[in-house]
Amino acid sequence: VTQIESTRLCHNCTTLGGNSGSVVFDLTNGQAVGLHFSGSFLATNYAVRADVVKKLLDDIHSGRWRRQPGGVSLTFPADGGETDLIDETESVASDYSDRGGYDPEFLGSRFVVDLPTVTRHADDVLDFEFDGETQTELRYEHFSVVMSRSRRMCFLSGCNIDGNLSKKSARVRWKGDPRIPKSQQIMKECYGAPPKFSRGHMTRREDPGWGTRAVAKRGNEDTMHVTNVAPQMQAFNAPIWLALEDYALQHAREDEMKISVFTGPYFTDRDPDMYGVLIPLTYWKVIAFIHDDTGKLCATGYEMSQEQSLQPEEFVFGVFTSPQLGTATQVPIRSIEAKSGIHFGKLASVDPLAGDEEGVSDAGPRTPLLALEQIRFVR
């Protein structure tokens, strides 16, 4: 799969006349990803996306197609039922006085990695009073969040992950953070059942869940603050995007198994207003760790767009199940800095893509990550 569009995908294979209607399979899992319908010699082939075909067939069988001359809305929430509920219990700011937040020295005193700094929109960083001083960093267990005042969601979330001490904990309900005004947090407006959006974690729920049983539980539960999310379609969560941290842990120094991860949305003038909220079209992620082979600090950057899932009149298709259909790409950290207005300190200089000037701009197509093995960790 070389490209994904709203109703079709492009694929690279050999076809002959009469192949139209043939199923395009993902060879990694045997699942159907589309129906081939045309091609251009030595250029590309086209297929109707499998989810589009399924939706049309479902509508025909149910009779809905006769009653829907216009666009339809269909998506699948990332979380349903209890997991989408808000915890109405009022917590107090003092409950967070023991949260250490993101630790710059987590990877070692020789490899200090500071929390990224919002530079271009510094005047839009939300500040708040806590412990007798003005702060801009919401500290949680093993991670921190920096909020945008105008967008009411985070500029970034930075997390320390210790793979050796990871523990699983039960999921809890979503909740607000009492340290900042409720008016600066998006509780429900754009979130809910389809066609609304899912709450997409910036710091993954599992990532700060490490340490003693009590500490791991607190880290897990802290990720369920609405300050740590942004609006995402379920189709956005492609397997490769979700697996980036785990793959980096496999390449981190074996005796430590530690990485630091930063995630956030790009805020642009193109972001559509839906349900009274400006919806980010693209997200970025930066991962830093000590490479097991070199013993040196390494950092890699990634992007993933959900724009293909946001169609006019909320014409949104269902989730793909094939990892071949992810649109995550590895990009230079300097490119992320330029587009986000966030400075990552020394990380841009230890990026294996540093010096790739072509990659800093948006000119030309980028190769999607179809397999984790495509990721470059060293120059």
Locations of regions flagged by a protein language model:
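Eukaryotic short linear interaction motifs
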Residues: 18-20, 33, 42-44, 166, ...
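Chymotrypsin/trypsin-fold serine protease catalytic domain
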Residues: 1-10, 51
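C-terminal cap/linker of serine protease catalytic domains
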Residues: 37-86
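Catalytic nucleophile loop of clan PA
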Residues: 2, 14-35
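Structural detector of coil-to-beta-strand junctions
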Residues: 8, 23, 34, 45-47
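Domain-level detector for secreted/extracellular nuclease and nuclease-toxin modules, and
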Residues: 79-379
